[in-house]
Amino acid sequence: MNRFADLTAAGVLTAFGSDSPVTDLGPWQAVAAAVHHHQPAQRISPIAAFRAHSVAGWRAVGDHESGVLAPGAPAHYAIWDTAASLNGSAPLPTALRTVVSGATVHDLGVVGAR
């Protein structure tokens, strides 16, 4: 089940999502599950898993402009706490700031604070 490595190797665009309320809505848990797949041969890198849960969703719906940080691109992005790890016992990453269409919609007030 969830043959992430096989799909990735075959060049299949793999976009993660959630089947909530069947399972908990947890994007980072899904990324961690793909990185630490129960079948070692089906594990994918953290970068591939993160892309599957971010930019791949835009690509799956035919949007080839969103999901990148580039001049003129729509400003949809999040800044994450990089001290977090996808190790099963480590705390999950925390969103420090989220920007949608250029407007800040979430801010913990720690980005750029000294």
Task: Label the predicted regions.
Residues 104-114:
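Glycine- and charge-enriched low-complexity intrinsically disordered segments
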